[in-house]
Regions:
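Short capping/connector residues at structural and topological boundaries
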Residues: 6, 17, 22, 35, ...
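Amphipathic, charge-rich alpha-helical segments that serve as recognition/docking helices
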Residues: 5, 9-10, 25, 53-128
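Short, charged/polar connector segments at secondary-structure boundaries
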Residues: 1-68
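Amphipathic alpha-helical extensions and coiled-coil-like segments
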Residues: 89, 93-176
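General structural signal for secondary-structure boundaries
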Residues: 1, 71-72, 174-176
Length: 176
């Protein structure tokens, strides 16, 4: 059994994982993970990597699973939908998931919106975050600014103005 290297979620909160592992140790896995068979043998996790990781942390050697034959496009869609419905993806994880659907499977923003149950403007706003300079993406990733603040920064004409505004935002947030 192997994780999906293209799954949208890239970080797993240690505290949340410990809580999930404790719950699984006490109650078991309440919902099976979704996997697909691999041509090379074995299976790939499509949905449920957090449950799988937490099960391993809890000492389980097996996890209930549903097996489905899925295309790469279906895997990406289901992984993104499942993550959006569970513990929130970080804003950049969500944006990168949408970008992968567009780049790898030629989805339009409208098709993504229908697939994940969001409005097209919500998809557009998420994707805009990928236009932030790398240092500001890091600030967003580490919770030093909100996605709303980050989108506001994109309205500045140049990167110097953006960076000055970002410093003000992070100072204000650290005072709260």
């Amino acid at each position: 059994l192997e994780p999906n290297r293209t799954q949208p979620r890239q970080s797993f909160d240690d505290g949340a994982m410990t809580e999930l592992a404790d719950s699984i140790a006490q109650h078991g896995v309440l919902q099976p993970i979704l996997v697909r068979p691999l041509l090379s043998g074995g299976y790939q996790i499509v949905a449920g990597e957090r449950r799988w990781r937490a099960s391993r942390m809890a000492g389980l050697t097996t996890v209930p699973a549903v097996i489905r034959d899925l295309t790469d496009s279906e895997v990406m869609q289901l992984a993104l939908i499942e993550n959006l419905q569970r513990e929130d993806l970080k804003p950049l994880e969500e944006a990168n998931g949408y970008k992968m659907l567009m780049d790898n499977f030629e989805f339009t923003q409208e098709e993504i919106a229908k697939t994940v149950g969001k409005s097209r403007p919500a998809i557009t706003n998420a994707l805009r975050l990928l236009n932030l300079p790398e240092d500001m993406q890091n600030m967003l990733e580490h919770g030093e600014m909100t996605a709303g603040h980050a989108r506001t920064l994109l309205s500045f004409k140049n990167e110097d103005q953006m960076k000055a505004a970002a410093r003000r935002v992070t100072m204000e947030l650290s005072l709260i």
